[in-house]
């Protein structure tokens, strides 16, 4: 009966979305909320918490589907205009993949490539990904999932994230699987193992990065000695000029950086070298140490600073004097959030209590920021 009731609720909610005018769906200023009874009461409670009307309408719809979910507003000190200005001031703050599929998100006039294969994102693209109202849907809202209040993660959910990746069956130096290690590290560090796994997928992709192999120092030495211009995939390497580099780069062999911490710079050479030198400074001479060290870095440098969602780690709206952001990919939070959702959905965990911490800006435009690709 519970399943039948849930299906009926979903169907009725979907039908309501189809039949209602767009102005009601998004709660246009001056319109009456499309709810009655308990739903209207909940909608009004959201507004009393501090959510604007357009947020409250979308979140009430989610509440009808997932009553255990909780939504908390995060009042942002900067205005919307100030935030967009800060996020677009430096070309490298928000980047978009050079793949032609994302061409509509590129800056209109800046044709420079950054970090070996990324263009500056346009102001319109930044506004779109920054605007929380664009992502108050069942899957996309998981970029606001609060790690500080995460419920106990099941191993099945973790294994769903690892499935089909280089981590699925691989073992670490101790003989532990990635799933075993992530469950243990997550518990000991105090950070959701599923979140860690999603971040690893985002950062490492197919698992072929030299930062995972333990021989990246030798690769850098080869790039430097041969003055190699590009990688096999065509990414610019930009090695230092001959005679300008002191020391033996092979000393960086045996170090690992699974979360790509400090992996930035102009060209592949700088990206790998910076990441390896950071790993060396932390003593990450096994993949297991790199896993634990990366998790501790995320906990101490982000979650404890209030940046406890992937959105807040991408778009730092917590600090007032500077930007403290984990990633440059303008769509990174959306991508990671969807991965989190899939893990929950495929393991029937969407009905458990989740807390979503959603930024609210002053001076937001009346309409949501449009998707440049539309």
Regions from the language model: what does each represent?
Residues 166-172, 231-241, 251-285:
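Substrate-binding clefts and substrate-entry loops adjacent to catalytic sites
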Residues 191-194, 204-222, 226-230, 239-246, ...:
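Secretory-pathway/luminal and periplasmic proteins that interact with or process carbohydrate-rich
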Residues 197-201, 263, 296:
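Generic alpha-helical structural context detector
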Residues 175, 182-186, 198-207, 221:
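Alpha-helical, low-charge segments enriched in small hydrophobic residues
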Residues 219, 244, 276-280, 291, ...:
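Extracellular protease catalytic domains of secreted zymogens
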Residues 202-207, 263-269, 318-322, 362-367:
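Solvent-exposed loop/turn segments at secondary-structure junctions
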